[in-house]
From Swiss-Prot:
Keyword Nucleotidyltransferase: no
A Gene Ontology term for the protein's cellular component: cytoplasm
UniProt keyword Cytoplasm, yes or no: yes
Native species: Photorhabdus laumondii subsp. laumondii (strain DSM 15139 / CIP 105565 / TT01)
InterPro entries for this protein: RdgC
GO molecular function: double-stranded DNA binding
Family of the protein in this entry: Belongs to the RdgC family.
Protein name, as recorded: Recombination-associated protein RdgC
Length: 303
């Protein structure tokens, strides 16, 4: 079981009936297929349990897990540039004239056509958790672009997907700043030793703190000078540690050993049972964390 390291959270903005059976049928036409000789990249759905299952959905406790795989051909631009330059110089020498831009572009296409079949591939997988009970879609992605790319694939499979990023009533950075300034956090949350502070004015500086007592005179001085906390490392219930950003994303999630060991009594040889138990455990904890964080930050913005 791959435990999520990041949470990009989206709210389904109207009642949408997502059933696992229907989803299985909808994902199937866009199953992952490897790049052909002339493809730069291909993306599609794969079973979340890998070789242990043929199903494109894993379902437990009203939660659905799906997985997208992407293959990208690696063609470093210096390699293309070097091959193109050699070709241009050769032709210009033979024809005793400078090549036009359209001719150079055509040569570049020829080079790509020649190099692509020999290019190495890079593979990546992105897990998407559909929380039907709470009407959320949560993506394990570290960047908004990667999350949006995978949402686009899901939207293509479903036909439509009415989602919006999870947004809050109050600016997150003001709440985080107050937590650091006062040292008083909502029940269940505790400050760690890492944060990022930014000046409100764009031309102002950025302070990144690591292994730092955040409730200190030094940090207080930065806050008094007009800086806001835009990223803050937090501990929740001594079960999950994470970095909360001012855009509402959770990154660098780390589950406590105590939490991860809860299912150690299940035989690891029984992959399906352990995967299922870990998925139920992870989604239960993350659902509680998300709900606690929403409440701690003052609630969601009005729909």
């Amino acid at each position: 079981m791959l435990w999520f390291k990041n949470l990009m959270i989206y709210r389904l903005n109207r009642e949408t009936s997502l059933s696992a059976d229907e989803l299985e049928k909808q994902l199937s036409p866009l199953a992952f297929t490897p790049c052909g000789s002339q493809d730069m990249a291909k993306t599609g759905w794969v079973p979340p349990m890998g070789s242990h299952s043929d199903a494109f959905t894993h379902v437990a406790n009203n939660q659905i897990l799906i997985c997208a795989r992407k293959e990208e051909k690696m063609l470093p631009s210096p390699v293309i540039k070097q091959a193109l330059q050699a070709k241009i110089e050769k032709l210009e020498g033979e024809q005793h004239r400078k090549l036009k831009k359209t001719e150079k572009d055509s040569l570049k296409d020829e080079i790509l056509h020649t190099l692509l079949p020999r290019a190495f591939s890079r593979f990546s997988q992105t897990y998407i958790w559909i929380d039907i009970a709470n009407n959320l879609i949560v993506i394990d992605a570290a960047s908004a672009k990667r999350a949006e790319d995978n949402l686009a694939l899901l939207r293509k499979s479903l036909g439509s997907l009415p989602v919006v990023p999870l947004t809050f009533k109050n600016p997150i950075e003001l709440t985080l700043t107050e937590w650091v300034r006062s040292g008083a956090l909502p029940t269940g949350f505790a400050l760690m030793d890492e944060a990022e502070l930014k000046a409100i004015l764009e031309e102002g500086g950025v302070i990144r703190c690591k292994k730092q007592d955040l409730v200190s005179d030094e940090i207080a001085t930065h806050i008094e000078a007009g800086k806001c906390v835009t990223k803050l490392a937090l501990d929740w219930e001594e079960r999950i540690q994470f970095m909360l950003s001012d855009d509402g994303t959770f990154k660098r999630i780390k589950f406590s050993d105590t939490l991860r060991e809860q299912n150690d009594d299940i035989d690891r040889e029984d992959f399906a049972q352990r995967f299922d138990a870990d998925f139920i455990l992870m989604t239960g904890e993350l659902s509680a964390l998300i709900n606690s964080t929403i409440e701690a930050l003052g609630g969601e913005a009005e729909k």
